UniProtKB/Swiss-Prot annotation:
GO BP annotations listed: mitochondrial electron transport, NADH to ubiquinone
Localisation per UniProt entry: Mitochondrion inner membrane
Any one cellular-component term (Gene Ontology): mitochondrial inner membrane
PANTHER family xrefs: NADH DEHYDROGENASE [UBIQUINONE] 1 BETA SUBCOMPLEX SUBUNIT 8, MITOCHONDRIAL, NADH-UBIQUINONE OXIDOREDUCTASE ASHI SUBUNIT
Range of the transit peptide: 1-28
Keywords carried by this UniProt record: Electron transport, Membrane, Mitochondrion, Mitochondrion inner membrane, Respiratory chain, Transit peptide, Transmembrane, Transmembrane helix, Transport
Organism taxonomic ancestry: Eukaryota, Metazoa, Chordata, Craniata, Vertebrata
Principal subcellular localization: mitochondrion
Gene name for this UniProt entry: NDUFB8
InterPro entries: NDUFB8, Ndufb8_metazoa
Protein name: NADH dehydrogenase [ubiquinone] 1 beta subcomplex subunit 8, mitochondrial
Function: Accessory subunit of the mitochondrial membrane respiratory chain NADH dehydrogenase (Complex I), that is believed not to be involved in catalysis. Complex I functions in the transfer of electrons from NADH to the respiratory chain. The immediate electron acceptor for the enzyme is believed to be ubiquinone.
Length: 186
C-alpha cells in the first residue's frame, strides 16, 4: 500500500514539475492567439481602417456587427450566404469549406457550411411549387373518386376445380359416379 501511495505521489510531483517546463499538447493545440479574437468595436475611421486591414478587407467593404453587447467586437459582418453559392470549380485553399487563406469566415460558419442551411436561390417560386403540389393532390383525389364510382374488374370465367369439380368434397354421393366435367374442347 505504501509503495502504491509513493508511486502516485511521484507521478503527481512529476506532473507539477513538468507543467512549467512544457505545457500539454492538447492545451497548446486548442490555444487561441490574441489575433484570433475580435478586437474592440471600431469607433473612429482609423480604427475601422485598421480592422479592415486585420481581416484582409477593403475599407469600403468592411462593416462590423452592431455594438449591441453580444461580443462581436470588430469582426466583419459578412453576407448571410451559404457556401453552396460559392464557385465549386474554383481552386480553393480549403476546398471543403470553400475558403481561401486569410479570408474572414462568417461568424455563423457552422450554420452556413455545405451540410447545413442552403441559402442559394431556388429555381422555382413557392407559388409554382404549391400549385404543382396541390394540383397533383387534387388530380389524385379526383382519380380515386372516379375509381370508386366506376369500378373496373378483370373479366373472369366460372371457377374450375379438379377431380370432377370436387364432387366428393362438396357432399356428393360416393356410390354414384359423378358426371364428367369438360373444361375445354380440342
Amino acid at each position: 500500500m505504501a509503495v502504491a501511495r509513493a508511486g502516485v505521489l511521484g507521478v503527481q510531483w512529476l506532473q507539477r514539475a513538468s507543467w512549467n517546463v512544457m505545457p500539454l499538447g492538447a492545451r497548446t493545440a486548442s490555444h487561441m492567439t490574441k489575433d484570433m479574437f475580435p478586437g474592440p468595436y471600431p469607433r473612429t475611421p482609423e480604427e475601422r481602417a485598421a480592422a479592415a486591414k486585420k481581416y484582409n478587407m477593403r475599407v469600403e467593404d468592411y462593416e462590423p456587427y452592431p455594438d449591441d453587447g453580444m461580443g462581436y467586437g470588430d469582426y466583419p459582418k459578412l453576407p448571410d450566404r451559404s457556401q453552396h453559392e460559392r464557385d465549386p470549380w474554383y481552386s480553393w485553399d480549403q476546398p471543403d469549406l470553400r475558403l481561401n487563406w486569410g479570408e474572414p469566415m462568417h461568424w455563423h460558419l457552422d450554420m452556413f457550411n455545405r451540410n447545413r442551411v442552403d441559402t442559394s436561390p431556388i429555381l422555382v417560386s413557392w407559388n409554382v411549387m404549391c400549385m404543382q403540389l396541390f394540383g397533383f393532390l387534387a388530380f389524385m383525389i379526383f382519380m380515386c373518386w372516379v375509381g370508386e364510382v366506376y369500378p373496373v374488374y378483370q373479366p373472369v370465367g366460372p371457377k374450375q376445380y379438379p377431380y370432377n369439380n370436387l364432387y366428393l368434397e362438396r357432399g356428393g354421393d360416393p356410390s354414384k359416379e359423378p358426371e364428367r366435367v369438360v373444361h375445354y374442347e380440342i
